[in-house]
Amino acid sequence: MLAKYSSTRDMLDADGDTTMSLHSQASATSQRPELGHTEHQRPSSAWRPVALILLTLCLVLLIGLAALGLVFFQFYQLSNTQQDSILQKEEKLGNLSRQLQSLRTQNRKLAETLHHVAEKLCRELYNKTGEHRCSPCPEKWKWHGDKCYQFYKESKSWQGCEYFCIAENSTMLKINTQEVLEFAMPQSYSEFFYSYWTGLSRNSSGKAWLWMDGTPYSSELFDVMIDLTSLRSRDCVTILNGKAFSKDCRELRRCACEKAAAMVKVQSLHEPLSRRWR
């Protein structure tokens, strides 16, 4: 009986152990998903700060882009404003430049008009007195047209007169217009046959007559009287008593020089005008 009880208890213990073992296995099986779920949730909690940081960086980047866009917009507006201002200034500068050019043109025209009036008045005074301080020519020089003339009493060869005129900052007399001819020929009248060298010459009898600057002589203005009895290697022209003669360039004749007239001395007109208006 004891043996039967003992075997029965052993069987119960064995069943209990089996039951406990099955319960333990079931408990372990039921607990594994919870551990897996716990392990699955841990990475999610770890990425939250990273995601928050990335979101913050994105917001900062968006704010920076917005600020950059605002700055670019302001710079664009400022650039357009400055460009408009530059265009306006360039337009004003162009208008001022045109006005200045117009004033310069008017000033030049006024100066030319003043010069013509002063020259006309000075010429009237000069023709009345034969000499005036307003004359654009040096002292003792004769004013005619736009040139100054001087007929010297010194006698020299043709080349000597050339050097003499150069020393006086002038050239030898050139008769190339009717006005100059009508002015110069009366200066050649002399009771003692003093003729004046001109700047007209030629190298030989077969060559053309040329003035000192290389321009040709015009026979329509005056004729040159040539002495055919004497042959020379070089001929030069003198004027005497309203006529032109071919002479040996080595002969001694008086010098006639010319130079361009300067500006009329306007300030020298004030004194005669004040006396004239009194």
UniProtKB/Swiss-Prot annotation:
Residues 1-52 are cytoplasmic. InterPro entries: C-type_lectin-like, C-type_lectin-like/link_sf, C-type_Lectin_Domain_Fam1, CTDL_fold, NKR-like_CTLD. It comes from the Eukaryota. Residues 144-258 form the C-type lectin domain. Disulfide bonds join 165-257, 236-249. The chain crosses the membrane at residues 53-73. Residues 1-42 are annotated as: Disordered. Keywords: Disulfide bond, Glycoprotein, Lectin, Membrane, Signal-anchor, Transmembrane, Transmembrane helix. It holds the Pfam family Lectin_C. Residues 74-278 are extracellular. This is C-type lectin domain family 1 member A. It comes from Bos taurus.
